[in-house]
Amino acid sequence: MATLKDIAAYANVSSSTVSRVLNNDHTLSVSEVTRERILHAAKELQYTPVKIRKGMANGKDIEAPQIGIIFAQSLEEELVDPFFSSIRHGIESECAEKEIFTVKSFRLKGMKQEELLQDLDGVIVVGRVSPETVQEVSNHLDTIVFINHKADEDLYDSVMIDFEKATKHALNHLFDLGYKRIGYIGGTEREHYINGSSIIEDQRQTVFERVMHEKGLLDSEKVYIGEYSMTEGYELMAQAIKQGNLPQAFFIASDAMAIGAMRALQQSNIKVPEDVAIVSFDDVDVAAFASTPLTTVKVYTEEMGRQAVKMLVDRLSGRSIPLKVMVPTKLIYRESCGALLKKQ
């Protein structure tokens, strides 16, 4: 029997693209030629969705589950922040491998739950959402997995990363290298609801300020906050340069912002790491190829997406106890932190 991988190979596209096209995912940007090629391949290979075992729930085979994905972020936010697009890719890849092709994607803003959620067996919610939104979704569905959102652990599954541990690891590395005057560049964290969003604390900023304060090193004037984008990273570093008395190092809360920040430094003939060291967050693909390769906290975002799918399928197969998966992070050492200079 043909699989999504077979169709992907036949049509020369990825399995996740096949899954989204076959499910009529209108959030996917793909040419009509590619879409037709995938549909033709599915027809030629006589593809039909596979079945999964319901498990101990009733012992019967059922058609592949109807799974929904709710993205708290707008499309614009996802495009400028690879953190969320990588999570999406992990979800889609795991669904493709499990032959779950009935995946529906929604944006939270303006979503009508009654119309969109009624035919679903379960849903994955990506991003921070308000308690009211959690309640509204749970009114229509029992099976919900949250990614990067701390929901009620007694009720819901969640996939998280330990921002506190990761931030402390990055800062301790800078301390070990002898840096004391450390600045921060980061974005605003938002809690989303159907008709908008509100700004809430960002754990990276909170932990940074607490650790620096405890060491008597916090300079609030060297904390720069904007939006999570390359452009904002550039603008905030330009602001820091104009302000003068640059810190010895910066902890920057995303690689995209760090790349923008390094561009601003380069234009002012300020060298990284000779003049200013940088440690950032995410380890996106381009981090290793930046003008100065970035030392950065690697977040296994794709694995977060994969784990969420596994947990959802496990729930649909009969597991009743809610679980919380904490995906680890890892500091990736490259040139921007100045470690090599310290050794010379």
Predicted regions and their residues:
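N-terminal helix-turn-helix DNA-binding module of bacterial transcription factors
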Residues: 1-58
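Alpha-helical recognition/docking segments in bacterial nutrient-uptake
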Residues: 2, 59-172, 176, 241-242, ...
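Short beta-strand segments enriched in small/hydrophobic residues
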Residues: 19, 57-77, 181-194
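Structural signal for hydrophobic
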Residues: 67, 144, 182, 275-276, ...
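Periplasmic-binding protein-like
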Residues: 68, 119-126, 183-186, 223, ...
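Hinge/beta->alpha junction and helix N-cap segments in small-molecule ligand-binding domains
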Residues: 74-85, 106-111, 159-169, 185-236, ...
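Flexible loop/turn connectors
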Residues: 238-344
